[in-house]
Amino acid sequence: MHQSSLGVLVLFSLIYLCISVHVPFDLNGWKALRLDNNRVQDSTNLAVEHLAGQLKQPITAFKLEENIPNWDLYRVSFIGTYFKGEEYECHSDVVWIFNPFNVTVFNTGCLPTSQLNFKY
């Protein structure tokens, strides 16, 4: 009985460790970032501006962890107010190029929050 309980504890500990290590890294090279990161905030603000809305709440942010010199790629998602005050959940990719300096927002999309099954 004691050995089976210990085995179950070890198994759950191993599963927890694997999940904890996987959380900040997506299998495709995307790393989760904190929402208070300056580049994340700038990327989110540029995406909201690109979509001609107002930011209500950031949701998630990721950075592509590829070793490509002179550029960074961010994927941000957020709640914004658009079109007669309606709220939308949106996502955008933002590429930062450093030589020469340029920022481009692309791959944008939005869904009305009224169509989502959950509320933030």
From Swiss-Prot:
Keywords: Secreted, Signal. Its main location: secreted. GO terms for cellular component: extracellular region. This is Insoluble matrix shell protein 2. Component of the acid-insoluble organic matrix of the calcified shell. Residues 1-20 form the signal peptide. It is found in: Secreted.
